């Protein structure tokens, strides 16, 4: 049992009756039925699953990685990378120029990344409109949905002063005339310990 004063959402969910099947422990095929099956439990999958379940649909989420609880986090990067990230945090872009820290655990990248939260940028929405026929995906049409999720996920301005490297980045951006501000984060009870 954890001695942390911060509640463990995984343990709370299991206590409420979450049905979890660890595929790594199965020794026979199983048949499951649902109205909707969602592949991936990251930001998009998790929010979609909750929205659909609240509307009365039965939902199954299929996740490649394991379910980890607060008690499973030992604050050791050597253990975290192989157990929580795709390709042990070695995934890269095709040209190998950029590392991609993509989660491979329940919660996906929302479990392992820094909780930065921002609305889909207008140029991205415009790209989706032009290339995927999503004409209704405008900032105005999505604003109430963004607001609903921001409230649900406790998204707010990060009030902790930036560390020196981020402050230097902010000052440099200001000198170049580039707008810069503290990023919005989805946190509740964060102690800013660096983990």
Language-model segments: residues:
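Conserved redox-cofactor binding core of oxidoreductases
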Residues: 2-15, 114, 135-195
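N-terminal glycine-rich phosphate/pyrophosphate-binding loop and immediately adjacent elements
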Residues: 5-128, 133-134, 139-140
């Amino acid at each position: 049992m954890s001695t942390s004063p911060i509640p463990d959402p995984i343990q709370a969910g299991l206590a409420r009756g979450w049905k979890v099947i660890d595929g790594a422990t199965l020794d026979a095929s199983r048949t499951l039925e649902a109205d909707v099956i969602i592949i991936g439990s990251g930001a998009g999958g998790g929010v979609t699953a909750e929205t659909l379940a609240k509307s009365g649909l039965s939902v199954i989420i299929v996740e490649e990685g394991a379910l980890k609880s607060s008690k499973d986090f030992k604050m050791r990067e050597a253990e975290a990378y192989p157990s929580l990230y795709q390709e042990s945090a070695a995934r890269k872009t095709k040209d190998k120029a950029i590392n991609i820290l993509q989660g491979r655990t329940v919660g996906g990248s929302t479990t392992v990344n820094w909780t930065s939260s921002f609305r889909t940028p207008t140029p991205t929405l415009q790209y989706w409109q032009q290339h995927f026929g999503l004409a209704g995906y405008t900032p105005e049409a999505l604003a109430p949905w963004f607001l609903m999720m921001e409230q649900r996920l406790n998204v707010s301005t990060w009030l902790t002063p930036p560390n020196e490297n981020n402050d230097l980045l902010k000052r440099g951006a200001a000198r170049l005339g580039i707008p810069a501000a503290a990023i919005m984060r989805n946190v509740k009870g964060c102690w800013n310990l660096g983990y």
